[in-house]
Amino acid sequence: MAPSKKAGKKVTPASKKSAGQGKVAKADWKEGFKKKQVGVSDMTLLTTISNEGVNENLQKRWTNGEIYTYIGAVLISVNPFRGRSVETLQRYRGKNRLEVPPHVFGIAESAYYNMNAYHENQCVIISGESGAGKTEAAKRIMQYIAVVSGGQDSSIQEIKDMVLATNPLLESFGCAKTLRNNNSSRHGKYLEIMFNGVGEPVGAQITNYLLEKGRVVGQIENERNFHIFYQFTKGASDEQRELFGLQGPEAYAYTSLSNCLEVSDIDDVKDYHDTITAMGVIGLTPDEQNEIFKMLAIVLWLGNVQFEEMDDGNSSITDTGVTDFVGYLMEADSALVQKVLTSRVIETSKGGRRGSVYDVPLNPAQATSGRDALAKAIYNNLFEWIVSRINVSMKTRSAHAQIIGILDIFGFEIFEDNSFEQLCINYVNEKLQQIFIELTLKTEQEEYVREQIKWTPIKYFNNKIVCDLIEERRPPGIFAALNDACATAHADPAAADNSFVQRTAMLSSNAHFEARGSQFLVRHYAGDVMYNVAGMTDKNKDSLIKDLLDLVGSSGNTFLQTLFPDRPDPNSKKRPPTAGDRIKARALVDNLMKAQPSYIRTIKPNQNRSSSEYDVKAILHQIKYLGLNENIRVRRAGFAYRNTFEKMVERFYLLSSHTSYAGEYTWTGDSKSGCEQILKDTGIAKDEWQMGVTKAFIKNPETLFALETMRDKYWHNMAARIQRAFRNYMRYKHECARRIQRFWKNNKEGIAYAQTRDYGHQILAGRKERRRFSLLSYRRFMGDYLDLNGKSSLGEELAGACNIGGESVTFSSRIHLLVSKLGRSSKPSPRFIVVTEKAVHILILSVRDGQTQYNLERRIPLSTIKSIGMSNLRDDWLAKEGDPLISCYFKTELVSNLVKLTRSTVNVVIGPTIEYSKKKDKMAQIKFIKDETVAKDDLYKSHTVHVASGEPPNSVSRPPAKRKPGVVRPITQGKLLKAGGPSDKPKPRSVPKPKPVAQPLPGRDSTTVAPKPAIKPSVTPSSTVGQRPPPAPPRNIAPPPPPAKPETPMYRAKFAFEGQEGEMSLKKDDVVELVEKDDNGWWLVKMDGVEGWAPNNYLELVPPKAVSAPPPPPRSRPAPTTTPKISLTSVVADASSKPVSVFPGMQPSNGSATPWKKPLTADTTPASSRPSSAIGSKPPPPVAAKPKPPVIPVKPSVSAKGPAKPPIPTAPRPPAASTSRSSKPATAVGQVDLAAAVSLFVTHSRELLLMM
């Protein structure tokens, strides 16, 4: 039934024309069922602005598959590391960014729309570190523009095809596999697409920036050369192999020395055919393609030219057959090739006249350098030629009106050894950051001025001072100093480097520069980078020697000569351009400043290319140096939200009775007055919003949230009736979900603990016997046992002694260090060990002037630890290469932490002996032998450790204990389902038949077995066992006097001590009883019935007091008349019997309990174990073991692809921890079967639907 019209309210017919009425459609009730938003899609609406808040919001969205987020008009993209559907492309066509979720298509649509609407050039700047998804974002933008730009003309479609074909072609020649990215762009490119007046592409142009040509001749371990070399050597035809003498990539030095020929997600043969296809689309002729591959063959064979040193120190070619083939490919004389590669012609001049000519032979190192220089020059010039040839094919067919530029450039780089390449890359990124800051603030300010909005200008850091430091000519910057050094000492690279070092000293007045000898530091926006001067001037010159240019000039191959068109004039006094001059950053900046920018900031979620791992720490660092927090603050400095009057009214007209009725738009005035009416009717304060010329501005995000909440409630109220009809179903659904969640929560932690525990098994790799308590099912790895990361006094003192600053402590514990003293044998001495992210700290406790203090005895950087030695027995000793030999209860956990922190570079050596450096240049050896007489831990004496046999090396952790089954409540219990559904009566539980237990009769020996009582199966067994016991002996007899207590030494605490688990916390002047002394400085004491360990230097002896007379015995009472109950495990004692304690796991034998004859020792019960007593008198508490707090493991990340390929080992080492299926631990007992739970939920859901 349709709702009736409100009295006195007249609805304007749709046919009548009114201001803005015809453009607003009736509100749709389906909006109330839209998918709930995860986080906020525009981070200018964050309630709390901080780097952590930005990180948390990005993590929420990325975890739920939302990889895109806005900061105003800036798009943040977090690489998902998985393929995504492109079916959403049409959703963004003709829509503004507020109408659809954030996406790279939204940025492309905005740029294309603004170009057509405002007739302004646009550019999209994509930035981020390597592997963050810059190239993929650029592909999506080109794909979107090709689809939406229209045009049916064949020439327009040809331009679109060529623009898309540039991607596989330039990726093959300009991308390579690195440690961080399998398809890393090793060059920067700026693609400009030209459009005519109606928005159709009529041409394009690509500008190349700084190809990493050094990769051609060398790569680090597990990286590859450019893709095209592997595609060519694997996918070439038989004709090409015959023509170029081509073999596999393993046959060439330039492609095989890095030991990475295959990549899991790259098909080189398929990519080779795609490259050939792209060449055809671009318009490269077969002859041009043949010449390109011939140049690649020349580069590959040049790498195989090897040199050997002769007796006079000069070089000679090892295999002249290789140079003969190089001469054949270059169409040059092979003898000239050999001569140019092994010697150099030097010409002297005097007074401007030509002097003598000398033929100087080269040593092998110089010859190798010349060979590599020629190979790099050929490939670099070939890449430049390909880019130029693409531009020729894509040149404009007609006059163009506007341009859309797409910048895909290398990200900021910081390595251990940074040289000239990193300086150039970081300089370009510094310039882009400057553009980002200036244009963002400029656009913001212009909008406020244009809309006549009052606001306060924002102060920000201008990194122009860093750009001037690098590029300025007067006063000279870094590039100018490099050019001057190359000009003054051009003949000697070492002298040129020294000249550059002297010139950089003049730059020290800049606060962002710091000279440090042969290195210098630049404080970039993304962090401080230390650059190495060695080789910088030589790389900056970037020119071939005259001999190599003459070799190219003598070639009969015209294509090869075309690659080297510019040859320096020897008589010219003009300095040739250097590599720094060729960066062309100024030209790039000029092009970008002429266009209206759109920004895409890409973020890399992890270094493992995993689609499920979100590295919070790494992403937080990227958020900081990308300046996302500052960008949000700039956007929110004036007003957090703005929109046109028309869009504002269309969004919120439901909130005012003056603008809507029953979902119909009824406002007859203009849009601006409609906005004001809505804001007034919703009670928004006047200082929270302003009206501009064309837009409404809202100051705080909370105001916008309030408007959105009121709008959502409108539809919620309308949907309340529908919700009632589904109430029973929703309750049932939620109950199923809660049960599944409850089951999962109860078991997921156990899985994480098992995975962390198994990591230690993988490191030991079945090479070491294990202690029994190391194989507990849920032994937790806490790590920081001394609480350095907490607020305990001990942790604070140790942290202060270590001076760790802001470093995070991953492991800390008490240990014993083997200390050698003069004239005496070595002896274990108590110490403290603290492991941080950077180093291992060993501390000692000492007493001075009656005060205890902790002193740092040694600090070992993690980078210096090469190996760890352990025995193959169950002892706790281990030795790190570089002196210390320690004994640690948590040895497996310590080794696991060191392996993780060093990324598996530490070698774990396990054997019957440990060899360590006792003193400088003096090695010592410690032996480990089995000795079953050692009852507790191990015994060290004279470089020999005696230890009892442990669990077998291949032992695995014990399965978790089974839980006691509880009462299962049916899911249909209560009002979840209506009558007629599944029965809610629980099934009757069967009563197990009790087992008869022998009962000792009173007055007889405890070993006598009583007859079995007759017990009915249906009756619960009674403790009386059917017989009436004799009455208890009379209790009115006075007890005998207690025996005299032995004199126990008592000690008083001199200082307060805050103990951990297993330790006794003491206050000053507390009196404790001494139970056991240990020679390691810790005593076992007892106070108020509780035992624990305390340091002996905190205690002082209390003089014994006089023993007082015992108190009189209590009055006797008559014995009770009731019969005492006898349980199945209790013992009826006579007058001479003593109470017996029954511990868990101990069962009575022959009807009687075995007395506990000796106290429980530390080698049979862990410190955390607290056995409870069964029926009978309470025994004295067992002796507490030395402190061993439980460990809380860090949850291991789950990798879908298994562990990464480890580096080639130099010595035996344990396999890296893996969470792949092959190494997944067995399912714990009691683990929830989620598949069964979900199946049960689906079954009940079907039953419910059938009932309804």
Curated annotation (Swiss-Prot):
Stretches with biased composition (Pro residues): 989-999, 1028-1046, 1178-1193, 1204-1215
Family: Belongs to the TRAFAC class myosin-kinesin ATPase superfamily. Myosin family.
Region (Disordered) residue spans: 1-27, 945-1049, 1103-1228
UniProt main location, coarse: cytoplasm
InterPro entries on file: Fungal_myosin-I_SH3, Kinesin_motor_dom_sf, Myosin_head_motor_dom-like, Myosin_TH1, MYSc_Myo1, P-loop_NTPase, SH3-like_dom_sf, SH3_domain
Domain of life of the organism encoding this protein: Eukaryota
SMART domains: MYSc (SM00242), SH3 (SM00326)
Domain remark from Swiss-Prot or TrEMBL: The myosin motor domain displays actin-stimulated ATPase activity and generates a mechanochemical force. The tail domain participates in molecular interactions that specify the role of the motor domain. It is composed of several tail homology (TH) domains, namely a putative phospholipid-binding myosin tail domain (also named TH1), an Ala- and Pro-rich domain (TH2), followed by an SH3 domain and a C-terminal acidic domain (TH3).
Domain SH3: start-end pairs: 1046-1104
Post-translational modification remark: Phosphorylation of the TEDS site (Ser-356) is required for the polarization of the actin cytoskeleton. Phosphorylation probably activates the myosin-I ATPase activity.
GO BP terms, alphabetized: actin cortical patch localization; actin filament organization; endocytosis
The keyword Cytoplasm belongs to this UniProt entry's keyword annotation: yes
Function: Type-I myosin implicated in the organization of the actin cytoskeleton. Required for proper actin cytoskeleton polarization. At the cell cortex, assembles in patch-like structures together with proteins from the actin-polymerizing machinery and promotes actin assembly. Functions as actin nucleation-promoting factor (NPF) for the Arp2/3 complex.
Protein name: Myosin-1
Record domain TH1: where: 770-953
Organism name: Laccaria bicolor (strain S238N-H82 / ATCC MYA-4686)
Low complexity bias (residue ranges): 1194-1203, 1216-1228
Binding site for ATP: 128-135
